[in-house]
């Protein structure tokens, strides 16, 4: 059954790599259109990860209402599919009082879950699931990443290679079907058509400038108390939510595998690599209009041109 059509309702989707400036831009747009922001960041959902995931500050969340921020306990499993369903329910509800809504994040799969939907994946047997979980425990993530590069090189180029859940999921599908996981992801179905219109905006910067901003953000996070945040989460270090850049490296420091200087350097390097994979994901999409984050007037003008609106006084 198709969803009821929502004419003249627009979901403004703002994507881009980490540290590019999505939060500040979305707050500006949300204030301009007097609307709300839905986060599609797969780590900002979790409580107790405020610094390491660069959650919007309390002051920013008081300026503009944000959804799916700081709302789940650290040990909660929250998938892209579940997010897609729950966020669509929220979007349909919020469109009762807003003409425009914002969806933003750097997690491509979560953005896709809302904008396009995710195709049903094959059932995975307990034997296959157990095989890869045991391999992960015995050989570590690097062995799984190497296998993924062979089994599905296309997905290898865009997935967060520091996230064992996503790497294992892809390998499970490869083994269960004999086909690359990316082949299932790229399928499109008619029932995924959304009843509202989408305006997709991408943010990017010169690569060197982006990397400088990443390094500066990491330094700022350390000054804000990232190490103390990670130390408090150490008992939960095996939770999926914490298998991510910034936390894994500092867990390594706490385990005395790295010096603090080495851990910080690794966070910067791995964040730059993650940003590159984010850009690879998003630049493959032809319906995204790209801007620099400081092109505020041009972005607002593009939204008005898309909707045929002459502007808001």
From Swiss-Prot:
Residues 41-44, 165-169 are annotated as: Interaction with substrate tRNA. NCBIfam families: miaA. Disulfide bonds: none annotated. Monomer. Coiled coil: none annotated. ATP binds at residues 16-23. It is an enzyme of class 2 (transferase). The keyword ATP-binding applies. It holds the Pfam family IPPT. SUPFAM superfamilies: P-loop containing nucleoside triphosphate hydrolases (SSF52540). This is tRNA dimethylallyltransferase. Its cofactor is Mg(2+). Catalyzes the transfer of a dimethylallyl group onto the adenine at position 37 in tRNAs that read codons beginning with uridine, leading to the formation of N6-(dimethylallyl)adenosine (i(6)A). It comes from Amoebophilus asiaticus (strain 5a2).
């Amino acid at each position: 059954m198709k969803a009821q059509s929502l004419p003249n309702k627009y979901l403004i989707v703002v994507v881009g790599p980490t540290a590019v400036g999505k939060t500040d831009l979305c707050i500006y747009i949300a204030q301009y259109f007097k609307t709300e922001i839905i986060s599609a960041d797969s780590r900002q959902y979790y409580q107790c990860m405020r610094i390491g995931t660069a959650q919007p500050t309390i002051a920013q969340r008081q300026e503009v209402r944000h959804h799916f921020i700081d709302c789940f306990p650290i040990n909660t499993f929250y998938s892209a599919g579940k997010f897609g369903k729950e966020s669509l329910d929220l979007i349909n509800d919020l469109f009762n009082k807003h003409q425009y809504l914002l969806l933003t994040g750097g997690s491509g799969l979560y953005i896709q879950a809302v904008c396009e939907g995710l195709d049903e994946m094959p059932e995975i047997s307990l034997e296959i699931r157990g095989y890869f979980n045991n391999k992960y425990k015995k050989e570590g993530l690097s062995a799984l990443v190497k296998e993924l590069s062979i089994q599905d090189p296309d997905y290898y180029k865009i997935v967060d290679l520091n996230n064992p859940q996503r790497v294992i999921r892809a390998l499970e599908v490869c083994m269960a079907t004999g086909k690359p996981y990316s082949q299932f992801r790229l399928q499109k179905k008619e029932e995924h058509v959304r009843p509202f219109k989408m305006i997709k905006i991408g943010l990017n910067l010169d690569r060197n400038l982006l990397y400088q901003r990443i390094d500066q953000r990491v330094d700022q996070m350390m000054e804000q108390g990232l190490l103390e945040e990670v130390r408090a989460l150490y008992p939960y270090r095996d939770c999926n939510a914490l298998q991510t850049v910034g936390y894994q490296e500092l867990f390594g420091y706490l385990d005395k595998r790295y010096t603090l200087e080495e851990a910080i350097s690794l966070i910067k390097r791995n964040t730059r690599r993650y940003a590159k994979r984010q850009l690879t994901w998003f630049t493959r999409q032809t319906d995204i209009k790209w801007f620099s984050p400081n092109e505020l007037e041009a972005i607002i003008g593009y939204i008005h041109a898309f909707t045929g609106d002459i502007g808001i006084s």
